[in-house]
Structures are given as C-alpha cells and as structure tokens.
Amino acid sequence: MFFEVICLATAAAQGVAVGDLIPREVLFGNPERSSVSISPDGTMLAFRGPVDGVMNAWVQPVEGGEAKALTNFSDRPIGGLSWSWNGDQLLFSKDAGGDENFHVYVVDIAGGEPRDLTPHDGVRAGISETSQERPDEIVVSMNKTNPQFMSMYRINTRTGEQTLIEENEGYLGYILDDDWNIRGRAAMNEDGGLVNELRDVGSDEWYEFLTIPSDEMMNTSMAGFNKAGTRLYGASSLGRDKAALVWWAPKKGGGESPTVVFESDKADVSGGIGNPDTYEPEAVVVDYLRPEWHVLDSALAPDIEALQKLDQGDFNISSRTKDNRTWIVAYNRDNGPPRYWLWDRDTQKGRFLFTTWPALEGAALASMRSVEVPTRDGMKMPSYLTVPVGSAGKNLPMVLFVHGGPWARDSWGYNPYHQWLANRGYAVLSPNFRGSTGFGKEFVNAGNREWYGKMQDDLNDSVAWAVEQGIADPKRIAIMGGSYGGYAVLAGLTRDPELFACGVDIVGPSHVGTLIGSVPPYWKPMMKMFDDRVGSMDEPAYIDAISPLTHVKYINKPLLIGQGANDPRVKISESNQIVAAMNKRGLPVTYVVFPDEGHGFHNPTNNMAFNAIIEEFLAAHLGGKAEPVGDDVTNSTAQLRDKGGLSLAGAKTHVVTKGEDEPVELSVVAIDELSPEEQQQVQMVMAQLSQMPIEQLPMVRDQMMQQRAMAPPESQKLINYIIGQLDDKIEQSTKQDG
C-alpha cells in the first residue's frame, strides 16, 4: 500500500517502551525512503531506498502503485539523486570504496542499466547546472585534465556526449548565467582572499569585480545570476557581522555597492528558495537555535504559514514541479524520524506520503533541547542537549559529541546518534564551538589558529557547564567525534585527559602537518585558507604543538579509533601513526579499520558494526546500557587491528604491522646500487626525516609504500632504499624504548 498507515499504526501500537533498548538495526539501518523528489510533470516520485541493504534509486507514481528499483548497486550507496528536466531520467552520483571520486550517472525511468556520464579513472565530477530550456543536458565540473582544478563540461544525458565549456587554468570555481555562459570566476590571492572576476556576455575581457578578504570568506560568496542576468545574488558579511542575502549589479564597479535583500542580527542567512522561472529569491531561512523562515515574495506567504502548522518540527521544501504548484515538503522532528508530505499550492492542502524509518514511529525517542553554553571569554555557543526519556537529567554519564569540519555546525532535529546514546542511558551534548559556521564572521574567525587552543577550551567549557547544571557526572564523561571531531577527541585525551573517562575518534587526523601534506589534489588551491585558519607548514614547531601525535605520551584514558582504509581526506596513516605511537608506549587502544570505507562508514553493516563496538566501549568505561554485539561485527568488513582490552565475542583480531594494509616484500638495496643523483636525493630526504618526531615515521613509511605502488620501475630502488632506512630507524626507536 502506498501510504503506510497500517505500518505506522502497527509501529505505534508496538512502540518501544521507556527503558527498552531500541535495536541498532532500527536506529542505523537504511531508511525505507529518503531524498524524495517529484518529477517535473508531478506524476512520479523518485527516492533513495535499499536493495539488498544498499541504497539505490527508486520511482513510484504519485497517486499510488508499485515502487520500482531502477538501480541495483551492491557495493556503495548512491547519492545526489535528482530528476532530469526531461522527466524521463534520474541523475545521481556514486564513488568507489569511499574514495570520494564521485561520478555522475543517469538512468532511464523506463528501465535499462544506469550509465556513467563521467567514466574516467581517478576523476571527481559533480553536477553544476541544469536547465528547463535544455532538458537533455547538464553542466558538470570535472578534474579530468588537471586533478587540482575543475573544468566545466556540457554533457548530453541521452547520448553521453561531452563538450568542453571552459578549461580551468587555476580557478576555484565559476559562475554561469542562464545561457550557460561563463560569466564569473574566482581565485585565491597571496593574502588568502578570494578575487572574483566577471565578464560581460559576448566579451572575452575579464575585470576584477570584488575581492573578498580572507576573514570574510566563510560568510561572503557569490551564488548565481537571476534569469535576466541583471543581478548577481550571494551572501555578504562585508560591513556587518552576520551574512546577509544581497545582490550586486554585474558590471564594472558593481561589487562595491551590493543591495541588501534580507539580514538578521541572530545568525547568517543560511538557506531559502528561489523562483524556478525568474531565479529571484522567494524566502530565506535563518538558523540560530532553530530554523526561522522569512518570506520575501508575498505570493508564498500563505504556503509558508500553512506549512508551519501542517506537522511537527521544522520543514524544508525539498522538491517542486516545473509549474511550481506541487511541492515535496520534508519535516524534521527531534523525537521522530523525518516525514514527507505532498503540498498542493492550489488547494492549500497537504497529503502525508511516508516516514523515512517507519519502525521508529511510536518508539520512545527523546526530545532535543536547544541551549546556549557560555565560554570562559564571554561568547555563547548554540548547542543541543539530549537526555534519556523518563530521566530527570541529573548526574548522568555524558557523551560530548563534537561535529566535524570544523567549518560546519550542529543543528536541531532528529539525530540517530543522540537517540541511540540517550536510549543507552547517556546525556549527549553537541556544542557549536568557535570556528563553527552560521553564526557570523566574528564567531567563525574566533577559531582561527585555535586548534588545540580556544576551540578545545570551548569543549571543556561545555563539559563544565553540563557539570555545573547537574546534568553530567564529572567522572563519567566521554568525548566522541568524527573528522575534526576525531581530532578534538585526540586533542582532549592528550591536552586535558583528566576531564574525560574515554574517547572515540572516528577518522580523525592525529598530526596537522601530515594531514595538510596528504590532502586530495582538488583541495590544494585552497590551502592558503588552511594556512590562515589552522597553521602553515612553514612553521613546523607550531604545527607540531597543535598536533595530538606530538603529545601522545599524555594519553592515559581508553581510546577507540575507527578508520576507513580508502579515506582521501584523513588518510589511514593518520590513525596508523598514533596507534603505533601508543603501542610503542604500551598504551591501550582499540583500533578498527574498514577496508571498503572512506571518510566515514556508509555501508549500514559497517556502521552498525562500529556502533556495536562503541556501545560496548562506552558501557565498559561509562557504565551505560548495551545491546549485545551479536553478529554485527562478524557480518561487516571490520578489521579489529587492536582490541584494546574489549571482549568482542565472535570477533577476531586482525593484526597488521608497520601500518601496512597488505604485506609487500621489499628487496634489500645497498647505497652503492643507487646513482649519484639518487644518493644525493637520499641525503636530502634523510636530512628532512632526521628533523621529524619518531612518532611520524610510520606514517611517512605508509606514504612511501603508496608512492612505491605507483612509481615507475626505474624509481623502485630509490624508494626501497628509503623505506629500508625508515624501517631501521623505527626498529632502533622501538629497541631504545624497550
């Protein structure tokens, strides 16, 4: 049945009682439907749904009928699902093994195999533009000719024909008008600012339009032209703290005097919708603690007002028909899974479609509180607190859950991690520490060069607040996070170990220098921003000082690390090197690697496996409740490289030495086998290595092994010799410490 009334009623009747453990499979299994959109003519729905446990593309008639899977990928989930304007095809993206080299695919809704529109090895591609006037074409950005820069291509979705629009010779991005003319481009200058240039239609002459200083770049940007090409819309914090919606006249000198469309003194303008015919803004969203809609076009006022009453939670308009009369509206609740509605603008009535996780309807889910947490220097951190259902919220074990980025933010709404941890008996606090985005330039810039410093102080202040409020038991606090949040975990356990009972690091970097030195090539044009906001490789002492690996000897609390072997952002060597350093010092660590994952765990069986390990880990060190591990770990690809004292029944430890993922035999090379030029290179490399902390050498060895795999035969002897020297240094260090 199309509408899941029976399913919802059954779930509600069988609701999980307060105190019962909600199974991980229910909390972290695939949603039945997500990423819902409506076809241009309003007759069909598209959504992501599982096929044998992997998220694929589906379609279903709006008026009911059987849903049909259009793809059958078994290795990785699809993402970015959307309709082509021709109404006959769906577009989506997919990578391989978590490498984040996403390709653009198309599939016909009538059936047939999906086709890769960007079938190039090692290339990253994404859709930049679509158009009602060109329904069979899209504009794609792709680093096919230079891995650092994205060139622009026009691709026919029916034939697959590619036409180069603009070869990128060093720009961070482009702006196209409605006719797909390249009208704007941007490049970073020596000061870390962004120089925006424009050109007029039919002209090859570029002129400087607006230079955005480095301290404004997180809050000021150009988005795109209106359909007429007379206004260039964007966000600007120039002359103010919070980013406002503005437009510039696209002409010489026009960058100096933007027109403000809407601004708020609470937070940045962070979202909204535009007219699909004119590309003029119709409404904007400002999100401080909760999203607030502000109508710009009075024609939308009745819709927005009615949608605010249609269902619980905060809504967003996720898809619209070509005539803009029918919308797909998603509601985000804190104590229930998201719900999708069909909104008829003519009748001003909504029709419930489905919920993303029907099994969670009626479950005893917790509410999320929006709170302001003070910092020691007088700032306020918009934060989100969840406590167990039925709990008084006092003297609880607590998980400080740190978001990644760090130039991102946490928001109010349904969060499976908050629900899971609260269901196991923990309070969960997610602070938006300085450096988080969305709260104005002063707040984000306060995090500049404060990794391991004031950004970490903010996390400690969050702990202090929770203890002072009587929420958290000071002896039972864990710190957990992914990406930058994982870095914050390592920083917390090395800088302030007395605050935390344990830590969970998910794909977090352990050394800022090795992180910067191994970023994907398409990040390199932006590295000046990293220099200004984090630190420069030209100041190695500072980089060492803000790197947890440097301070590894201070870890005296249990640590769990999860890592994807194919992570292109935070390489596996980041986790390998801190695990090696801890092992050398006899410090306990639980280390889990997933060979088929990247920056995060997207395969549900892998995600559930790692969460099962987290659950046992937290129960052991904080005393919360835990669902038995069962077969969750053995059903995944998890490699338990170090159990760290955990007794994971049925799971075998997979031991990997020296950070190698696969054993590789290396031939022994003597120095006299190398040419004079190669011997000189060895001297230079070894001189550099002599200046590095010994803890970093396993990571360097990993990188040399990766280079060896790609190097031509004539370079093998040189690389083998250097690896041999590294092995000797690592072995000598181990013997000395022993």
What role is predicted for each listed range?
Residues 47-71:
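Beta-propeller domains
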Residues 394-404:
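Short beta-strand element of the alpha/beta-hydrolase
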Residues 29-34, 52-57, 73-79, 85-382, ...:
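Peripheral, non-catalytic segments that deliver or gate enzyme domains
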Residues 431-664:
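Active-site-proximal cap/loop segments of hydrolase catalytic domains
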Residues 1-10:
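Bacterial N-terminal signal peptides
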Residues 690-698, 708-717:
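Charged, low-complexity interaction regions
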Residues 9-15, 19:
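Boundary at the C-terminal end of the N-terminal hydrophobic targeting segment
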